[in-house]
Amino acid sequence: MEATLEQRPFPYLATEANLLTQIKESAADGLFKSFQLLLGKDAREGSVRFEALLGVYTNVVEFVKFLETALAAACVNTEFKDLRRMIDGKIQFKISMPTIAHGDGRRPNKQRQYIVMKACNKHHIGAEIELAAADIELLFAEKETPLDFTEYAGAIKTITSALQFGMDALERGLVDTVLAVKLRHAPPVFILKTLGDPVYSERGLKKAVKSDMVSMFKAHLIEHSFFLDKAELMTRGKQYVLTMLSDMLAAVCEDTVFKGVSTYTTASGQQVAGVLETTDSVMRRLMNLLGQVESAMSGPAAYASYVVRGANLVTAVSYGRAMRNFEQFMARIVDHPNALPSVEGDKAALADGHDEIQRTRIAASLVKIGDKFVAIESLQRMYNETQFPCPLNRRIQYTYFFPVGLHLPVPRYSTSVSVRGVESPAIQSTETWVVNKNNVPLCFGYQNALKSICHPRMHNPTQSAQALNQAFPDPDGGHGYGLRYEQTPNMNLFRTFHQYYMGKNVAFVPDVAQKALVTTEDLLHPTSHRLLRLEVHPFFDFFVHPCPGARGSYRATHRTMVGNIPQPLAPREFQESRGAQFDAVTNMTHVIDQLTIDVIQETAFDPAYPLFCYVIEAMIHGQEEKFVMNMPLIALVIQTYWVNSGKLAFVNSYHMVRFICTHMGNGSIPKEAHGHYRKILGELIALEQALLKLAGHETVGRTPITHLVSALLDPHLLPPFAYHDVFTDLMQKSSRQPIIKIGDQNYDNPQNRATFINLRGRMEDLVNNLVNIYQTRVNEDHDERHVLDVAPLDENDYNPVLEKLFYYVLMPVCSNGHMCGMGVDYQNVALTLTYNGPVFADVVNAQDDILLHLENGTLKDILQAGDIRPTVDMIRVLCTSFLTCPFVTQAARVITKRDPAQSFATHEYGKDVAQTVLVNGFGAFAVADRSREAAETMFYPVPFNKLYADPLVAATLHPLLANYVTRLPNQRNAVVFNVPSNLMAEYEEWHKSPVAAYAASCQATPGAISAMVSMHQKLSAPSFICQAKHRMHPGFAMTVVRTDEVLAEHILYCSRASTSMFVGLPSVVRREVRSDAVTFEITHEIASLHTALGYSSVIAPAHVAAITTDMGVHCQDLFMIFPGDAYQDRQLHDYIKMKAGVQTGSPGNRMDHVGYTAGVPRCENLPGLSHGQLATCEIIPTPVTSDVAYFQTPSNPRGRAACVVSCDAYSNESAERLLYDHSIPDPAYECRSTNNPWASQRGSLGDVLYNITFRQTALPGMYSPCRQFFHKEDIMRYNRGLYTLVNEYSARLAGAPATSTTDLQYVVVNGTDVFLDQPCHMLQEAYPTLAASHRVMLDEYMSNKQTHAPVHMGQYLIEEVAPMKRLLKLGNKVVY
């Protein structure tokens, strides 16, 4: 017997066995005996024979384990020894199309048969086995001693272990290959369930149908992802799980070309419908929920044989059964093509040969879903043992978003009955509370975002302008009004305004003015897309710069301060909320009360305000000595006006108010009136102290931080009216290159003071110069005299902040902007006063009432109009003041560089900020009808500043303006009122239309004063740092976007016999022969053939194993991402980085990839992590008026939908129009174009920040959660992928049979993995996360039994709407 065995070339070629385990035992026994048969002295010579022995062993043993798995139930497993000769190709199957026999006389349909083309794919798996030469030598050594036998046994064990390692690798490789094949044919359940619904497939693939399908995708993702987790907290969790599993079973196609094959059955003989492949934890949960029906099933004990003879590989289909081998095909089809079919003749074909395959009992868990038995197993242990990732454990990325700092519009309401303490409508949220993955409440405020919102790229308009030029290369040139100041060659302001308004019949309204008057809904409406197009940046006003004879270009000027943000994006109520914050953070107690404000407002709107007050102001023109000289007259006017009307005279002038408070507290005027004046001055002082407290006392280099925080504290913003030499003082102290334009002359050097400034000191010091002053007044051409007549500046007495608070805050609020600049003709004023007989007649008693001696004339008219009865001496003293009065009212244009935090610009003069200062002019109220004729002879309107350009007031000062506003009624609004470009150019000004719009619409209250002060906070990084420190709103909201990653465990369902697996013979080759070892490589050919007539597998996420990111509030550090961007002032740049908390490091540190993922410079710099990997939050600046409902549903963070799958025929042009064309409504919200114009438009701030096109020079590969929503190429790719995905799946699932001309393979379409693992990429939507604008809303939400999303006045809560539904627990309170 031994000799017989010894001569067999391949001993133990096949071992017949009934049980799978016996196969392995017999093969191993044969291997050990075969070791004894090998003879030879040289180990390397023996290795040749050993190679043949190894091939025998692998042929017998391999792939037995696969038959023991439940996964084999989804396959038809066949041994195919000639597989190595086959290449990838197509195999034809013939199927019959069923029909319906009609009973109404219609002709029956003919039988239709189709040829189905199935792709056969080969797979190559292999393993290496390395055997030591010493062990092989021991096998061939003589065994003479017991030690020899011991070494021999040890060598056999060593070699057997190595062989077992290789065989085990191949067996696992087969299982892994089959699982990979199944996954390749397994779309997500939400796709199959939706597209497989005949309700949709019967309607065709129109726009509406595709839109419905995508909506169902989204709904299924949110409602049914991770259904096992959701079932745990349901009252009917088991029924829900059964429903989900039933949907999975129903979604797949059970029809295969192997009809009737029942390879695997239960013990009772019932067919196993399929197999559920999952992970250990999911399997345990399912078993606990559903219970095990049976613990074993009957399956084949060996592979079926498949033999091919001939040149071609043919698989035939007859009677709906797959033939066992080629002989059956030959006998049935080829040899006897005309044979009549019979049951006896076709017994073998009908049985498929399975009656000859021996069966055995296989351990498996079976569950019953509906009426079907399904095997369930987990292969996770196989992967865990090999330390390879399990294919059913997938990492899924979900992007979340939430708002910070939104302002809820009026009327405000509450849906909560338990929240108390935050009822005030003035409370404005500056933070958002979120809950991280460990249920820790975290606050995200502006302090967190400083590393983003303070970065220079956030404050640079250049890229936005370039993007606009590329997107709209041929802009409408426009009218050019308000874009650039035009210097005038002369100093005659009357001529300037007269020439401008004379015959003017056309008014131009710049965009900045238009936006200030529309509502939020109107601005965002599709019909306003032209107006909205240039609203792309929160900090800049963009405009089209006309170029005669050339194409226009886009330019931008800085908005400078918060108040210049258009009202639709920062409404009046919001600014008043910021004012309340200003009061709170500075502990501001208003000195002024509502009564005083009402008196000022009544005075401003008093049609009988004495014109004589302006005459007195003109004679005093801010000079304290002249005020003291004329105190009796001033006291008389104040007392008369107060007694007659209860109103305050001279309240329009800061200097008059200050002088009254300083010199008239001795009872010369009524105590009540003096109290009002003192409250006005006290309010200004209190506001100044509050501003200084808010800004702090730090310095940046040599610049006080106060200059960079508030425009009111910036010395480069001068008061609007000047009577002293503030210009030289500015030039001497400024480092921003100030230029004072006096007509067409530039005063830019203090050394030229004598050329441009004529100082008028005290009257007693000018006694010797009175003749020269008179000669200059009479002889000089004041139109061409480019000299300013002002008094010397007393620095000890000069407080510009109080003056600016008065003119830029108090008066606009109390008068509702009902004021206009006024020029004075001093010569005519003097004539009115002096050319009267009693004034200088010695015969008239100085103490007599002058009205007793005046003849009819202008002076008598204005005195009678004001019911003022001065003495002759009072008028004489007033006339004396004229001796050193200025000659005319003049205008000086003050141009300075912007502060270094606002120095970025699109053009050179955009780096400048300018204002017009009215020299020796005044701010006037409306003039009464009875005084207008007199007023016209002495005064004229000078609309030079947005806060001092009320057209209705100007119309009362001169009939030319009255005729103008009558011809053009739309010019009666101060916001759109056209003024000469020689006086003002709105885009260059400190104050723009939104400030004037607020002043015109606000309620005159102390709160409005605080609001106007806070509106002067600058839109710059130092100001943001200051406001964030004090929890004060900076003027814009933020959309925070964060991507989190979860480790999800999936369920894969495969229907029975849906894949045919062909297993070939192994090939063993020596890969390497060394002196100490021999390496063998075992390669196996495997082929797979999908035999189902549709999708036979489906996958669904069932359980969240872990959340790998912290779901926290860590903000992106743009200083690290864009290290090359910097402010021009290095000291400022370093100050901002320090205050923003930017971690500095060497360039090597910046290159660490962790910095791009988590926003930290290096991992070793972190002492530790508490909640897992830091998830990066990115900031998208957002208007505070954005709809909060937008953040309560899955939406695109850029503010406009970007999913274009609903297009009839996909094209990039259509996709781009839907993305960027704001004349088309947002498909998700038909009432508007966008929810955030600063992010959704071409060239918007969000676009240039996160569109990778604009970051290529920095770090193109940087990780960014916002990139997926902004980078156009990515969006197009995802849209095209989704469009293709829907079309491809619809074509496969439409129900039409596949033919040879429509070769469709039922595999997952490209992009399916992205859809499953990154649904936010594909759907272009982020999910709302639990977020509350105040901690109290979060506490109320967690403590209420019936969970809801409460709204309480200005506070709101956003519930989490996402596929992963978290169990939220704060303390002992749980909310799901």
Swiss-Prot record:
Subunit structure: Homomultimer. Makes the hexons and eleven out of twelve pentons. Interacts with triplex proteins 1/TRX1 and 2/TRX2; adjacent capsomers are linked together in groups of three by triplexes, heterotrimeric complexes composed of one molecule of TRX1 and two molecules of TRX2. Interacts with scaffold protein; this interaction allows efficient MCP transport to the host nucleus. Interacts with capsid vertex component 2/CVC2. Interacts with the small capsomere-interacting protein/SCP.
Localization, UniProt: Virion; Host nucleus
Short name of one Pfam family: Herpes_MCP
SUPFAM superfamilies, sorted: Major capsid protein VP5
Family: Belongs to the herpesviridae major capsid protein family.
Species this chain originates from: Human herpesvirus 8 type P (isolate GK18) (HHV-8)
Keywords on record: Capsid protein, Host nucleus, T=16 icosahedral capsid protein, Virion
Name of this protein: Major capsid protein
Known function: Self-assembles to form an icosahedral capsid with a T=16 symmetry, about 200 nm in diameter, and consisting of 150 hexons and 12 pentons (total of 162 capsomers). Hexons form the edges and faces of the capsid and are each composed of six MCP molecules. In contrast, one penton is found at each of the 12 vertices. Eleven of the pentons are MCP pentamers, while the last vertex is occupied by the portal complex.
UniProt cross-references to InterPro entries, sorted A to Z: Herpes_MCP (IPR000912), Herpes_MCP_upper_sf (IPR023233)
HAMAP family associated with the record: HSV_MCP (MF_04016)
Name of the gene encoding the protein in the UniProt record: MCP
Molecular-function GO terms, alphabetical: structural molecule activity
Record GO cellular component, one term: host cell nucleus
